[in-house]
Amino acid sequence: MESLGRKVKEDGVVIDEKILKVDGFLNHQIDAKLMNDVGKTFYESFKDAGITKILTIEASGIAPAIMASFHFDVPCLFAKKAKPSTLKDGFYSTDIHSFTKNKTSTVIVSEEFLGADDKVLIIDDFLANGDASLGLNDIVKQANATTVGVGIVVEKSFQNGRQRLEDAGLYVSSLCKVASLKGNKVTLLGEA
């Protein structure tokens, strides 16, 4: 996705050789037009897969996931990092480690919203080590639902996330692949 790649290169801030900050358009302030294009691109990639639910994790995955759900015309469901007082029982849970925050959280999804008939597209903002997507896939499995694929907005191709997801049998579609953050510069896959 060319417009996303341009945005990542122009507005992304390299924190170090493994961390890219995209707060200006994805993780804090959201570029709605770009997220609409992201959602539409995910739709084009998975439109024939019979998707019934989009699943993400709060908070940064919500913007691209909601736009994808708009284009698919299916509900968007997000795993919560804290159990709300309104949810007494009947939920799936798993532990997910955040690469960026270096913190493990137990996330939950209500059984009310995810079931065996669902065909799920997992969407996340970043792919680093793959822990978030693997955790969400675990929740899908607990529901006896089917993960059709994983849609990633920005993949850090120099980390092992894609390999871990593919080793788990998951199809991965990434819209922007970052090859390197060396020299305080974003280099996309395929660039010299």
From Swiss-Prot:
Cellular component terms (Gene Ontology): cytoplasm
Indicate which residues the UniProt annotation says bind xanthine. Answer: L20, N27, K156
EC class (word): transferase
Q: Which UniProt keywords apply?
A: Cytoplasm, Glycosyltransferase, Purine salvage, Transferase
Would the keyword Lyase turn up in this protein's UniProt record? no
Q: Which GO terms describe its biological process?
A: purine ribonucleoside salvage; xanthine metabolic process; XMP salvage
Q: Does the keyword Transferase apply?
A: yes
**UniProt EC number:** 2.4.2.22
The UniProt transmembrane annotation reads none
Q: Where does 5-phospho-alpha-D-ribose 1-diphosphate bind?
A: A128, N129, G130, D131, A132
Catalysed reactions, semicolon-separated: XMP + diphosphate = xanthine + 5-phospho-alpha-D-ribose 1-diphosphate
Tell me where it mainly resides.
cytoplasm
**Record-level Gene Ontology MF annotations:** xanthine phosphoribosyltransferase activity
The record describes its quaternary structure and partners as: Homodimer.
What the record says about family reads: Belongs to the purine/pyrimidine phosphoribosyltransferase family. Xpt subfamily.
Enumerate the PANTHER family for this protein: HYPOXANTHINE/GUANINE PHOSPHORIBOSYLTRANSFERASE (PTHR43864), XANTHINE PHOSPHORIBOSYLTRANSFERASE (PTHR43864:SF1)
Role played? Converts the preformed base xanthine, a product of nucleic acid breakdown, to xanthosine 5'-monophosphate (XMP), so it can be reused for RNA or DNA synthesis.
Name-wise, this protein is Xanthine phosphoribosyltransferase
The species this protein was found in: Staphylococcus epidermidis (strain ATCC 35984 / DSM 28319 / BCRC 17069 / CCUG 31568 / BM 3577 / RP62A)
